Every structure is written in structure tokens, then in C-alpha cells.
Amino acid sequence: METIATRLAILPFPEIDPVIFTIGPLAVRWYGLAYVAGILLGWLYARRIIQNASLWRNGTAPFNLAQLDDFLLWAAGGIVLGGRIGYILFYDLGSILENPVRAIQIWNGGMSFHGGLLGTTLAIIIFARRNAIPLWSLFDVVAAVVPIGLFFGRIANFINGELWGRLSSMPWAVVFPTGGPFARHPSQLYEAALEGIVLLVVLAWFVYRRRALKMPGLVTGIFVCGYAASRIFVEFFREPDAQIGYLAGDWLTMGMVLSLPMALVGIWAIARARSAAAAA
């Protein structure tokens, strides 16, 4: 039976198969393609940043293209392993303990941005120390390109019909196949716009207009604060994970709890970068 919420939804859910094509037993999915596209396009953008001498103090980047290329595999490992482990620890530990095999079934979904961030942070620290690269400069380059991956990842979430929003009567609400016969906020698209497009533009402005890379740590701090603010805002429209629900009342979610410390770290990084620049 058609509901009022269904009639109010004017944005139909696109019937896109999560699987793009198959080659024998191998299924190529939009979600996997989003990760590949995000990493490769981010890598290409990072190369442009490194090659632009005017962006850097002393007219040259503190690491070269070959080192960036070597870091690509480290970044991919940090994203995938950290994202999966983070999801298990933050969102789905109980069911994983009941069925440990699910821990490796990434194709069924279950990745955490906060876990991926921690994994990538660890990869950056180890790689920078092993290769004598200034830690904050590597952080800054990675931070400047991360929104590209966030954009593609959230679009893939939308295509998969997962991580949908709360009930909505807005004219752009969507009835998702797995969300019941109710119109919901397309919160994945909100995140793609804020965490992806808006944050990418803001960071690019600081990199190219304000020459923020000459203040190591500033771009990182802006990214962390920007993501935290965007995520906390969207959490008010996003349905919490069913296995966790709300942590308090009908508003506090795990995404908010994990993002608040990020905002504090971002503020600290910005203050540190400005203080170091003033003392130089």
C-alpha cells in the first residue's frame, strides 16, 4: 500500500545493480570501484600538489613523487584494514564474535571511515619515519585529497541503498529498497556533498590561495575539523546502525561520538601549525 511518505518522495531510487559486471566467479561492484577511483584520483591530485613548487616553503616539496608512489600501497592498506577493523570494533563486534568468518566478508559491506582514518594515520606515521619524510607535510598532502575518496564512497553507499537517512517528508526524500515503504533523507548524498565536494573545495582554497602547506599541519587540522563538523551535522539526518541505535535519547549516535574527538584534534593541529609558523 502506498503511504503518504511514499507519495511525497519525488526522487525515485535509481535501480542500479550493486554489481557492475562479473567475470566468472569475480563480481566487480560499485563499492569496490569507488575505493579504486578515490585512491587513484587522490594519488593523481597529490602528485600535482607535490609538483607545484610555489605551494611549498623553500620552493620544493619535502618528499618526491617516487616516495608518494611508494606510499600509495601503504595508504590503500591503511584504508581497507583500518576501515574494516574499525567497523568491527565500533559497530558490529557482537555479531562478528558470533560468526568470525564475517570479519573478512568485506564484499557484504561494513567499513568505517573513522577506522580507515586511524589505519591511514598509522600508515603515514610509519612510512614517514622509515623514509625520513616530515610527518606533518605528508599528513597535509593526504588530507587535501581524502575528500575525493569520501565523495565516491558515499555515492557508492547510495547506489547500494545502504546507510540511508531518517524518515523525511522533504520533496527530495527517497524510498530505499531496504528502508521500508517510507521516504527517507538521502543522507549519503548529503555526506557526498559536504565531506566530498565542499570540503575538497575548501581545502583546495587553503592550499592554492592561502599557501597553507607552508604551515605544516594546518591543512590536516582544517580537514579534520571540516569532516567532524560535516559528519556531526549529517548524523542528525542519518539513521543510526540498527545493531547500535541511539546511544542517548533519540539523537546521539556513534558517528557523533567518534567525530567529536576529531574536532578537538583538528583544533589542536590548527593551533599548533599557527604557533609554529609564528615562532619560525
From Swiss-Prot:
It is found in: Cell inner membrane. It is a multi-pass membrane protein. Its main location: membrane. Keywords: Cell inner membrane, Cell membrane, Membrane, Transferase, Transmembrane, Transmembrane helix. Its EC number is 2.5.1.145. A 1,2-diacyl-sn-glycero-3-phospho-(1'-sn-glycerol) binds at R154. InterPro entries: Lgt. GO terms for cellular component: plasma membrane. It comes from the Bacteria. It is an enzyme of class 2 (transferase). The chain crosses the membrane at residues 30-50, 71-91, 106-126, 132-152, 188-208, 217-237, 251-271. Pathway: Protein modification; lipoprotein biosynthesis (diacylglyceryl transfer). GO terms for molecular function: phosphatidylglycerol-prolipoprotein diacylglyceryl transferase activity. Catalyzes the transfer of the diacylglyceryl group from phosphatidylglycerol to the sulfhydryl group of the N-terminal cysteine of a prolipoprotein, the first step in the formation of mature lipoproteins. NCBIfam families: lgt (TIGR00544). PANTHER family: PHOSPHATIDYLGLYCEROL--PROLIPOPROTEIN DIACYLGLYCERYL TRANSFERASE, PROLIPOPROTEIN DIACYLGLYCERYL TRANSFERASE. Belongs to the Lgt family. This is Phosphatidylglycerol--prolipoprotein diacylglyceryl transferase. The lineage of its organism: Bacteria, Pseudomonadati, Pseudomonadota, Alphaproteobacteria, Hyphomicrobiales. The gene is lgt.
